[in-house]
């Protein structure tokens, strides 16, 4: 009888714990992307929303990205309006979340990924203001020697 009473009393506590633990575990599992951007840049904020909607947690620094880009080893010629760091890899510009997931899964020997400039149609540059316009662009794998190669093309 005492065992049954104990189980009846413990059941609500266990049920509550299971409903709160799952979302916390999911948040803990989301890869964290640390981002440096201009505080007034709207397309950067749209890229952050794109990452959040695709399984990433984000921490944003609105202090500009030039110093972060240099510190993380992204060549200036591959620069864009924001810089990120995830899993030891640098991200420069409007890199699609799909390619970031792929990068983390494949773990290539590289500095990270870059989408130079601000191509219309890339994540963060795809809002209503751009209509249906989609410019072709490449996601580049940035190598330690400063070189790069095409990681994924968007046409």
Positions of PLM-derived features:
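N-terminal secretory signal peptides and thylakoid transit peptides that target proteins
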Residues: 1-15
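Residue-level detector of anion-binding/catalytic polar loops
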Residues: 57
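Local sequence-structure signature of Cys/Sec-based thiol-disulfide redox active-site neighborhoods
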Residues: 31-46
């Amino acid at each position: 009888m005492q065992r049954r009473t104990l189980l009846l009393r413990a059941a609500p506590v266990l049920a509550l714990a299971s409903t709160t633990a799952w979302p916390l575990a999911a948040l803990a599992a989301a890869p964290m992307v640390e981002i440096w951007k201009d505080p007034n840049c709207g397309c950067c904020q749209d890229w952050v929303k794109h990452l959040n909607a695709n399984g990433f947690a984000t921490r944003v620094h609105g202090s500009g990205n030039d110093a972060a880009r240099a510190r993380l080893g992204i060549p200036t010629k591959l620069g864009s309006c924001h810089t990120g760091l995830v899993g030891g890899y640098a991200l420069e510009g409007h890199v699609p979340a799909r390619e970031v997931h792929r990068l983390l899964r494949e773990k290539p020997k590289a500095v990270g990924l870059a989408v130079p400039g601000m191509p219309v149609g890339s994540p963060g540059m795809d809002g209503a203001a751009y209509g249906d316009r989609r410019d072709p662009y490449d996601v580049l794998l940035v190598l330690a020697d400063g070189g790069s190669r095409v990681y994924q093309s968007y046409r």
